[in-house]
From Swiss-Prot:
This is V-type ATP synthase beta chain. Keywords: ATP synthesis, Hydrogen ion transport, Ion transport, Transport. Pfam families: ATP-synt_ab, ATP-synt_ab_N, ATP-synt_VA_C. It comes from Acetivibrio thermocellus (strain ATCC 27405 / DSM 1237 / JCM 9322 / NBRC 103400 / NCIMB 10682 / NRRL B-4536 / VPI 7372) (Clostridium thermocellum). GO terms for biological process: proton motive force-driven plasma membrane ATP synthesis. The lineage of its organism: Bacteria, Bacillati, Bacillota, Clostridia, Eubacteriales. Gene3D superfamilies: 3.40.50.12240. Produces ATP from ADP in the presence of a proton gradient across the membrane. The V-type beta chain is a regulatory subunit.
């Protein structure tokens, strides 16, 4: 029998103080029963002696401190999990949104999970094909990696996220592949886009969707990424699946964290975010990876919008410390009509060399990647010089590099949001572009690969 308390003494915004409590724990769920019988949910944020500070999941409107009562449920937030989750759409708290029945669970898991023992981690080493040349060819995603996408307000990161979720696959393996997609603090229009896109393309069948709308409570926004990762851990480590987790938008998550922190009157850190923002983000990002004792894996792509396109803002800054690289979207490329507008030069995948080469992608991948980076960087320099001094100031070689840079953006980076390129197609396009330059300029590629692949590219 659950004990009921009629000792609510204060309600301030989303917070409520309950006195004279016994045996209540941090993170415990509770229910508030109003005088009219309505039930609202809450969660314990802090326990000080016999006082418990709880956060409401819903509005505090209508709560009367004299007539309302609280009971604590003795458990934290849990997610019921089973294979039936695939193909379903849930709220940020794990409730079905698609009109289907509740999940009959194999088990119930605490959404906070457990940290993965560093000694039990397996090193990421298998290539994941996203079908996007700028990622597969130059900033390769590896199974078990944490690779964020840094975007800006108004850039098409939603379309890119949907494209990756549709197209991602692990090559050369019989293991099943699943996608867990968590949308945090998005508008109804964006939610409708994601759900419709996954259903239209059939990707919904291998996907678990968690949708948290902008008008949902902040506490739900904080729970949504953890719901997604809990589902991913079940699919990966209990069922042996390769799971790709995409979370958009981490900025909305951090804003919710700041809102809760301000309500608790905590001492703010940089830009008003709580001082524990780094630690809190790490509890999300570090749940990705591979385990020695499991065939499954969790690969994480968190997407965040940089306020004012500022890479030094606390959210992208701290995310960069925890994760293994970043994919950066460019407003300049977006204005040029390049889709997806991935700026390959400042982008980085720190584990890309572990997932490419003979037996994984192709033997010439590393050499062509390095040469494409170098040629594009020099081509951009040549174009900047031409703006200042005019085309006449460029040498014939510089003009070829400028031509290469334009062709690279148009043919390699830009592919639209519906084209799914194989890694062979991506490498073929790379060689075709490199054939614009004289062979003497291709100093980063071994002669054996030049002899083997360059003549074919020149013919195309």
């Amino acid at each position: 029998m659950l004990k009921e308390y009629r000792t609510i003494t204060e309600v301030a915004g989303p917070l409520m103080l309950v006195q004279k409590v016994e045996g209540v724990k941090y993170g415990e769920l509770g229910e508030i029963e109003l005088a009219n019988g309505e039930i609202r949910r809450c969660k314990v944020l802090e326990v000080d002696g016999q006082n418990a500070l709880v956060q409401l999941f819903e509005s505090s409107t209508g709560i009367n401190v004299a007539t309302s009562k609280v009971r604590f449920l003795g458990r934290s937030i849990e997610l019921p999990v089973s294979m039936d989750m695939l193909g379903r759409v849930f709220s940020g708290m794990g409730k079905p949104l698609d009109g289907g029945p509740n999940i009959i669970p194999d088990k119930r898991l605490d959404i906070n999970g457990l940290p993965m023992n560093p000694a039990a981690r397996n090193y990421p080493s298998e290539f994941i094909q996203t079908g996007i040349s700028a990622i597969d060819g130059l900033n390769t995603l590896v199974r078990g990696q944490k690779l964020p996408i840094f975007s800006g307000s108004g850039l098409p990161h939603a379309q890119l996220a949907a494209q990756i979720a549709r197209q991602a696959k692990v090559l050369g393996t019989d293991s099943k592949f699943a996608v867990v997609f968590a949308a945090v603090g998005i508008t109804f229009e964006e939610a409708d886009y994601f759900i419709s896109d996954f259903k239209r393309t059939g990707a919904i069948d291998r996907t678990v969707l968690f949708i948290n709308l902008a008008n949902d409570p902040a506490i739900e926004r904080i729970s949504t990424p953890r719901m997604a990762l809990t589902a991913a851990e079940y699919l990966a480590f209990d069922k042996g699946m390769h799971v790709l987790v995409i979370i958009t938008d981490i900025t909305n998550y951090a804003e919710a964290l700041r809102e809760v922190s301000a309500a608790r009157k905590e001492v703010p850190g940089r830009r008003g975010y709580p001082g524990y923002l780094y630690t809190d983000l790490a509890t999300i990002y570090e749940r990705a990876g591979r385990r020695i004792d499991s065939e499954g894996s969790i690969t994480l792509i968190p997407i965040l919008t940089m306020p004012e396109d500022d890479k030094t803002h606390p959210i992208p800054d701290l995310t960069g410390y925890i994760t293994e690289g970043q994919i950066i979207l460019s407003r300049e490329l977006h204005r040029k009509g390049v889709t997806p507008p991935i700026d390959v030069l400042p982008s980085l995948s720190r584990l890309k060399d572990k997932g490419i080469g003979k037996g994984k992608t192709r033997e010439d991948h590393a050499d062509t990647m390095n040469q494409l980076f170098a040629a594009y960087a020099r081509g951009k320099e040549a174009k900047e010089l031409a703006v200042i001094l005019g085309d006449a100031a460029l040498s014939d070689t510089d003009k070829l590099y400028a031509k290469f840079a334009d062709a690279f953006e148009k043919e390699y980076v830009s592919q639209g949001f519906n084209e799914d390129r194989s890694i062979e197609k991506t490498l073929e396009i790379g060689w075709k572009l490199l054939s614009i330059l004289p062979r003497s300029e291709l100093k980063r590629i071994r002669d054996e690969y030049l002899d083997k692949y360059l003549p074919k590219a020149a013919e195309n």
